[in-house]
Structure formats: structure tokens, C-alpha cells
Amino acid sequence: MAPISLSWLLRLATFCHLTVLLAGQHHGVTKCNITCSKMTSKIPVALLIHYQQNQASCGKRAIILETRQHRLFCADPKEQWVKDAMQHLDRQAAALTRNGGTFEKQIGEVKPRTTPAAGGMDESVVLEPEATGESSSLEPTPSSQEAQRALGTSPELPTGVTGSSGTRLPPTPKAQDGGPVGTELFRVPPVSTAATWQSSAPHQPGPSLWAEAKTSEAPSTQDPSTQASTASSPAPEENAPSEGQRVWGQGQSPRPENSLEREEMGPVPAHTDAFQDWGPGSMAHVSVVPVSSEGTPSREPVASGSWTPKAEEPIHATMDPQRLGVLITPVPDAQAATRRQAVGLLAFLGLLFCLGVAMFTYQSLQGCPRKMAGEMAEGLRYIPRSCGSNSYVLVPV
């Protein structure tokens, strides 16, 4: 019984070693990084930023939730609050992927803006010439009267005749209703008339709005009798423009107040040829283009048939840095897994070699020499039970 038990022990040891090697290789290939022993309770959706499902090799299915502090919790995928949280996170990820970020439009408060003289946006009103040839006096037309009523100024047009210098005066800041506004005077050769009207601030409901105009005089080589000065008068309360309206002149490109880029306007790109034949005996009127209350200019044709350019509002992109956290799971190294498999295979082969050597040695030790095979006595052979044993077995010959 002793030799049989020893061989079975060797076989059992070989089987156990082989089982351990195979189990180690199996665990080396699996990718179960998080083992969920218990499920968490309900977590507010506002604290979650990411979720993922655990690996199939983990056995028990669970949802791994990540909070803003990058803490991981196991949740049961069958619960309703877990399903709602997964849908909420999926919608957030879809919106972030579609837009590439959260785009927000900057809308400033309704208050007068201060336009610096050097960096602000220049606003000017360009008068369109209309040659009459009959009278050299400046008479208000119906469109100019409507502009006067909208601006709250006197019937006299605040115009100034400039010389043919072809230069451009710097904008003059004026204070009105809480802040200065930049105005600009253009000179167009040979002789042009430019108005220095104030761009009115956003109208607010309440008491009547007073408009203030300042006389602008430019150097001129013409007769002083052709120069007209501006005058200011209080606007009647019933003629005050409604809330959100603004009067723009022809050739002016209205820009939203929240624009961060400074764009300078060129000297009248559309009606340059109309000023060539405009003499001192001509008459000018103002083209009025209504603007909607939301701040975007309406594309309506002006008196000369041209279209006002459409302003483009800047879009500022902001991204939430907390939403950009990506849970990176460690990927097992392929070379390390191959190395572990090679080491396990070599160990298994070595164990088999050692087992073979041990069994050969055991069998060699169990064999007895021929001289101890027994002696013949009266037709019987004495065979010892084992090598070195004093007990014999009688075997008939």
C-alpha cells in the first residue's frame, strides 16, 4: 500500500500545480478592475459626471457611477433612479458631442454703454444727397421729419459742410443719459455733408427722453452762409420713440452692443458716385431704417433701394471643465500577459520532467536483483516480498 499511496500523492500534487497555473493564467487575462460587494443608495443626479458598466468577467452585473470628486460607487442597474441617472448622463454626453461645448450668447444689461474714443465702435449717419437744382436752401423732407421726430430734435438738420480734404475726423464723445457715445464725421471729396448725430441709448419706459445735440463745426473753404448749425430742443413726450426702437442712417452697419471686436466703417462704400455731382445747391435727407426690439437689424430696403448689411453676433464658446473628466481604465499589457503564459508553460513542463524522473527512480528502486529472486526448494520458489525484506512467498514452480 505504501508504493501506491506515494504515486497517488505525486499525481495529486501534479494535478494541483497544473490547476494553480491555469487559474493564474485565467486571472491574468480577465479585466475585472472593480469588484462590487454591495450596492449604494440613491445619489443626486447633479453630483454625477460619468457612468460605466462593469466587466462581464466580474460575474455580478453592476453600474459604476463616478461623482464630481471622482469617487466610484456601485449601483444596481435594475433600480429606477439608476436608469434615470443613466439617461440624464447620456443626454449630457450627446449634447456635448453634438455642439462640441456649451455655446452661450452674451446678453448685456439694458443700460447705456460707454464708447471710448479710441477703441469704441463708430456710429455715424450719412446723408444721402438729392439734387434739386431749384433751390439752394435745405428743406426737410417727410423722411427727414420722421427721423427728427424719432430722434427728438428740432426741424433743423444738424449738418455741417466740410471741405474736400478726404480725411476723417476722430470720434467725439458726448454724454447722454449716463454715458458718452462716440460719433464720427466723414468727409467725402469733392464736397460732402456729414451729420454728427448722437446714437440714442436703449430707451427705457418712464419719463420722457431728452435728446441733446451739439453744434459741430468743421473747417470749410466754402461760403460761410452755406454752413448750418445744429440746435437742441426738448422732444415732446408723445413723439418719444417706443421702447427698443433705434434709427440708423443709410450706409451704416448696425452692430450689437455686446460685440467684442472693433470694426471700423469705411467711408460710404455704396454711394460714392452719388457725391460727385452734388453741389452746394442740393438737398439731403435721412434714410430711416427701423430696427426690431431684439437688437437685430431688419433687412428692409431704404429709400435708395440698397439693403442694409446684416450684423453678425459673436458666439462665445465656454466649456464646463468638470464635464470633461473621462474615466480611464487601465488596459493590461499584452507583453506582460504573454510573458506570464510563457513562464507558466515552462513551469508546467519542468514539473512533468521532475515527475517522470521521480517515477523512474521509484520503479528502479522497487526492482530487486536476480540473486534475490528466490531459491528452489522441493518444487517451490521462495520470493521475498520486497527488497531487503525477510518475509518470503512460496510460489510453486
UniProtKB/Swiss-Prot annotation:
The cysteines covalently paired via disulfide bonds are: C32-C58, C36-C74
Q: In which tissues is it expressed?
A: Expressed in the seminal plasma, endometrial fluid and follicular fluid (at protein level). Small intestine, colon, testis, prostate, heart, brain, lung, skeletal muscle, kidney and pancreas. Most abundant in the brain and heart.
Whom does it interact with, and what assembly results?
A: Monomer. Forms a ternary complex with CX3CR1 and ITGAV:ITGB3 or ITGA4:ITGB1.
Database matches in PANTHER family: FRACTALKINE (PTHR12015:SF92), SMALL INDUCIBLE CYTOKINE A (PTHR12015)
Q: Where is the composition biased (Polar residues)?
A: 133-147, 193-202
SMART domains linked: SCY
The stretches that face the Extracellular side, renumbered to this chain, are: 25-341
For the region Disordered, give the residue spans. Answer: 128-265, 289-309
**So where does this one cross the membrane?**
342-362
The UniProt keyword set, sorted, is:
Cell adhesion, Cell membrane, Chemotaxis, Cytokine, Disulfide bond, Glycoprotein, Host-virus interaction, Inflammatory response, Membrane, Secreted, Signal, Transmembrane, Transmembrane helix
A single MF term (Gene Ontology): chemokine activity
Name of the protein in question:
Fractalkine
The answer to whether keyword Transcription regulation applies is: no
